[in-house]
Design a protein with these regions (language model features):
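Ser/Thr/Asn(+Pro)-rich, low-complexity disordered segments
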Residues: 1-489
């Protein structure tokens, strides 16, 4: 049973989506209270949040159905086309950021985004799977969800087949970077593979995983497929239960993506305990690097040496892409609760206890904080708390969404269970070569003791790791901090 604090976090985080979304059209802001524009990824998380609200009795099913229908109808009606202005999408994709009122592309720097469209579609397909009633309104939700997903022309963004481009600009055309593993775009490929109308071919997954070996290795005592910021180890797992299912790459490595994310979380925590950059407050219960707000793009002296600080940026600890300027985002730890509850629960409680007075408010945890940043200079965002450092002033939708959904998954596997009913997601996983676990067809489940044994072994390994980690954490209480973590060679 989770400590009572988590119920409070869930309720406040749910209210972020319920209260800040535009009641006229269902568009959810990228951030609040600054609320400059809507984010299509935020909308995907909002569509996922509403059923969590129903299940907890925070809104009625009727209210959530109304809000969901409003959103899906508006998404259907947003004008699409290649023009630079006055459109909200093209080829079934949507622009990353939309104007909160009209739903048009917010500005000329905003791209038509493949991965953000995928995050939106995960929410759309979640709604399709959840609202299974026989009445006309729930039927309309299912029909609209189908329509929106079928419209996305995934293959159009395959300019360098079989990989999918990060997006497109009406001014300059296709973005020259493609999504290659390993990162959050795992969910993009699964949705593109599962499409009934514009599917990419299975070799897309093969090529996406081809770069994995570059990111596989040992970091802070964990051997895993690395990506610096924790969001890359979380986003795909919000909707898909990767326990006991494996693609070819993970079969060869003998683990699954769930266990991989667990190792990433434990490595992040060990990095914070070792604290090679000597940032303030880092330790066993204050950790978690991901993308989020920061104070300012600036260089300042810290402990006698010049350090780079950033405003909104990806931050991470891993084998390759690392950036750490002392900024911690609570979502990094809290949304990892399914992977490593034995370290996430105490971290959440400690961050609430130590920083809650200024970090925890109406909608839960503000985006981020940096105890090491106390420079009296103009800030991009946030504020300085005397003696405590910098704290963000906004909540961010793509950081709030995983907090809410992952606590729900931890409690009763809610989001995962609903999503398992969605045939498109299942097809996408199968096309990517995933087998075992919940993907095993029922008639085959009896016939293949081999894969059952493998799955049971993987499950046992995961459980054993959890128990060992809990025991290890207990043992560490008696150790001085200095010998807790060995940084990588």
């Amino acid at each position: 049973e989770l400590p009572p604090l988590f119920r409070d976090i869930e309720k406040r985080t749910f209210q972020f989506f319920w209260d800040t979304t535009n009641e006229q059209n269902g568009l959810t802001p990228d951030r609040y209270p600054s609320r400059p524009f809507a984010s299509i990824a935020s909308i995907g998380y909002a569509l996922t949040a509403y059923p969590i609200g129903i299940e907890n009795g925070w809104v009625s099913r009727t209210q959530a159905v109304d809000r969901t229908l409003l959103t899906l109808r508006f998404l259907r009606d947003i004008p699409q086309g290649p023009q630079r202005t006055g459109k909200g999408g093209y080829k079934g994709f949507y622009y990353h950021f939309l104007d909160m009122q009209q739903g048009h592309r917010y500005d000329s720097w905003v791209e038509l985004s493949s991965v953000d469209t995928a995050l939106l579609m995960m929410g759309v397909l979640f709604a399709q799977a959840y609202y299974d009633g026989d009445d006309a309104r729930e039927k309309e939700i299912r029909r609209l969800a189908d329509q929106l997903y079928r419209k996305v022309e995934w293959t159009w963004l395959q300019q360098r087949e079989p990989l999918i481009s990060m997006g497109w600009f009406p001014e300059s055309g296709f973005i020259v970077h493609d999504w290659m593993g390993y990162n959050e775009a795992m969910l993009l490929y699964i949705l593109a593979l599962g499409s009934p109308t514009h599917p990419v071919s299975p070799d897309a997954w093969t090529v996406w995983t081809r770069t994995y070996d570059h990111d596989w290795g040992v970091y802070y005592g964990q051997e895993y497929l690395s990506f610096g910021p924790l969001f890359g180890h979380q986003y795909s797992h919000v909707w898909i239960d990767y326990r006991d299912i494996q693609d070819q790459y993970m079969r060869e490595r003998g683990i699954d993506y769930f266990l991989n994310s667990r190792r990433a979380v434990l490595a992040h925590r060990e990095y914070a305990i070792a604290n090679p950059m000597k940032w303030k407050d880092y330790g066993e219960n204050v950790w978690g690097l991901t993308a989020g707000d920061g104070a300012q793009n600036t260089r300042q002296l810290y402990r006698g040496e010049e350090r780079e600080f950033r405003h909104y940026s990806s931050r991470g600890a891993g084998l390759r892409e690392n950036f750490d300027d002392g900024t911690i985002a609570p979502t990094a730890a809290i949304a990892s609760i399914v992977f490593a509850p034995e370290v996430v629960i105490p971290a959440t409680e400690e961050m609430h206890r130590r920083y809650g007075d200024y970090l925890y408010s109406s909608y839960g945890f503000l985006d981020s904080f940096n105890p090491s940043f106390d420079y009296d200079i103009p800030l991009k965002t946030g504020r300085l708390v005397p003696g405590k450092g910098w704290v963000a002033s906004d909540y961010i939708g793509i950081d709030q969404g995983p907090i809410l959904a992952m606590i729900a998954n931890y409690r009763n596997e809610f989001v995962w269970t609903v999503m398992k009913k969605n045939p498109y997601v299942r097809k996408g996983l199968e096309q990517a070569g995933f087998r075992g676990g919940w993907l095993t067809p029922e008639d085959e489940a009896v016939e293949s003791p081999q894969s059952n044994q493998e799955a049971a072994a993987a499950r046992a390994l995961g459980m054993a790791e959890s128990r060992a980690a809990a025991a290890e954490a207990q043992a560490k209480q008696e150790q001085p901090a200095s010998n807790r973590a060995q940084p990588p060679p």
